[in-house]
Amino acid sequence: MNPTEPIWKSYIVETTQPIFTPKQCQMVIDKGMSLKKETAAVGMGQRPGGGIDPKKRITTISWIPFKDMPEMYRDIEATMLKANGNHFGFEGMRLTEVAQFTHYLTGGFYDWHMDNDVLGKHEPPVRKISMTLLLSDPATFEGGELEIMSKDKTAKLKQGQAIFFASWLQHRVKPVTKGERKSLVMWFGGPSFK
């Protein structure tokens, strides 16, 4: 299935300013660190082709319940809706999944992957927009760059800044070579592609 909507203005959008202050980032970090951590899986987790694969991904994650940080969810969804209206143009977009707190230690990475099932076998709602928000101060780690396979885009985010991109774009987090990288990952979905 090829996505046919909409006529694109852009596939990738960075916020011009941070969405969260350093204090707000620390609140999200504290929440993420307090929750049950799990070794991150690849390829739809427990589904065929999925599971834990240290050749493709080394990081721990935790899931932040909606009820624990409603203001965070409200602010990020509002920003996504603006980005969708100004750039993506999808119909019926909404927050559909809880946020993933990701914690990359030195040596942690996530190889090239997509965030949606382009064949639509496991959905709706269909993931259409992915977001990464950098929680760490970039001065506290080296490496860990987010690369998106679209015009060789490398995101150089400030603390609290977010990037939104089409969920079917291949992307990766390069290995962290020093320090720790903490980020918030979210997905937004809607009805199946037309």
Q: Which positions does each model-derived feature cover?
A:
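Fe(II)/2-oxoglutarate oxygenase catalytic core
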Residues: 1-162, 168-194
